[in-house]
Amino acid sequence: MEHFDVAIIGLGPAGSALARKLAGKMQVIALDKKHQCGTEGFSKPCGGLLAPDAQRSFIRDGLTLPVDVIANPQIFSVKTVDVAASLTRNYQRSYININRHAFDLWMKSLIPASVEVYHDSLCRKIWREDDKWHVIFRADGWEQHITARYLVGADGANSMVRRHLYPDHQIRKYVAIQQWFAEKHPVPFYSCIFDNSITNCYSWSISKDGYFIFGGAYPMKDGQTRFTTLKEKMSAFQFQFGKTVKSEKCTVLFPSRWQDFVCGKDNAFLIGEAAGFISASSLEGISYALDSTDILRSVLLKQPEKLNTAYWRATRKLRLKLFGKIVKSRCLTAPALRKWIMRSGVAHIPQLKD
């Protein structure tokens, strides 16, 4: 049975970045359910916008995005729609429009060969015994059993590692649904849509490489029905759909209290969305995935006496920032307050008409 210093479950932005940064310094194994290349297999449904905080992470790491990761067009504003109040406002935003699946595969491609990576793999079971973490996974057609001193859960909203560490922990979840359509709008745009009769989260749209993507986060029970209802309403705001090219869905976490941020225990650690590190006001998670990765890397390499305690303390600033997003979300999803803010015209950039 092979033994490693660190076993990473999941190679989204958080897991890939951690594997890359620990390479050559610790013996690392990493498991991921995505294929190594191509469009077959799992791909994460995502609007695919890289926020300024995530861009800063790449600046710190000295990385630049390859052209095949960047999507067309680049949009500098968000059209914010309040359906009930029939209000539309434009706010400046500095996002980079990306192809999320290509971005994830590029992040994986940066992992050095010294890391043992298993693509298209499935983690079947984890447990702790004799001060080691045991992992059973299936890859290349057969089951393997390894042990590790440290276990890292970078496995997203449905984190197996989080469920194992905190079996009684409950966090609000939504089903994120997206549909792709051929782009029909004369001017591509990015939008954020609020309709409290549909969801107490929000919906979105983005133009990307000749497609119009429409999606949102909805209650788990009847999300599809609510999604369809909102689509019908959006014709009043000049949204054009047509025939569906493809549909996607996944679970997304929605932290709503301080206790929703969990960092791990017993030499197991959670990073990115697995830890609840996702913005409640925008559902943006890549920047927090990268920030939590940097924090955990520092803790693992410095080897303080109590690693889990050190990681918990080191993420305090990040958790406070995310708690601020919870407060912001409550403001944005409060109909009266949102209506007042939008009617005030603060930060709104009106579009010139011919």
From Swiss-Prot:
Miscellaneous notes: Disruption of this gene leads to greater resistance to hydroxylamine and hypersensitivity to ofloxacin, 5,7-dichloro-8-hydroxyquinaldine (a lipophilic chelator) and 18-crown-6 ether (an ionophore).
Gene Ontology biological process terms, A to Z: bacteriocin immunity
InterPro entries: FAD-bd, FAD/NAD-bd_sf, Geranylgeranyl_reductase
Protein name: Protein CbrA
GO-annotated molecular function: FAD binding; flavin adenine dinucleotide binding
Induction note: Induced by the two-component regulatory system CreC/CreB and by the signal autoinducer AI-2.
Domain of life according to the entry: Bacteria
Upper lineage: Bacteria, Pseudomonadati, Pseudomonadota, Gammaproteobacteria, Enterobacterales
Family: Belongs to the CbrA family.
Family annotation (Pfam families): FAD_binding_3
